[in-house]
């Protein structure tokens, strides 16, 4: 399952960045703090809406921390190919504020995450429906994906 591209808008250290992936192997490297882990979070979070940087795969994203401090909302868009068909999953996150302007939390915007493809009769939206469809398309769940393709730092 090759990744085609990843767009991060107002996510962690990225104001607006699109990473285009080449066919075959791609190397992500850079100094500490350059955003390598954010790219991995974008890839994995885009597919499964879960956090890959923890030892256990779970839904423990700290959504307010994903969105840049200066921004009110952020967006992840991931394009990937399965069986010759391209799929795009979009995930938008909006911070929530109290009356004093302090961040109190965050949630996915209405209608997100969203999965679209010419291979689908119509776009699919909503956390559970998108997650179920992606698992069906790629033939594995988040835990199986991590165990197949990802090595944690320090492992």
Locations of the language-model features?
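Short, intrinsically disordered, charge-balanced linker/junction segments flanking boundaries
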Residues: 147-155
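Extreme N-terminal "head/tail" segments of very large remodeling/mechanoenzyme assemblies
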Residues: 1-132, 136-147
């Amino acid at each position: 399952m090759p990744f085609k591209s990843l767009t991060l808008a107002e996510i962690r250290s990225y104001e607006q960045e699109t990473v285009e992936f080449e066919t075959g192997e791609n190397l992500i490297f850079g100094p500490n703090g350059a955003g390598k882990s954010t790219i991995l979070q974008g890839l994995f979070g885009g597919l499964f809406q879960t956090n890959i940087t923890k030892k256990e795969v779970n839904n423990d994203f700290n959504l307010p921390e994903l969105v840049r401090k200066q921004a009110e909302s952020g967006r992840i868009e991931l394009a990937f190919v399965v069986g010759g068909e391209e799929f795009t999953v979009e995930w938008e996150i909006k911070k929530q504020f109290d009356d004093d302007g302090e961040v109190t939390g965050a949630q996915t915007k209405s209608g997100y995450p969203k999965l679209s493809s010419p291979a689908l009769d119509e776009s699919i939206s909503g956390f559970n429906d998108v997650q179920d469809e992606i698992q069906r398309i790629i033939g594995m769940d988040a835990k199986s994906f991590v165990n197949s393709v990802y090595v944690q730092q320090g492992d």
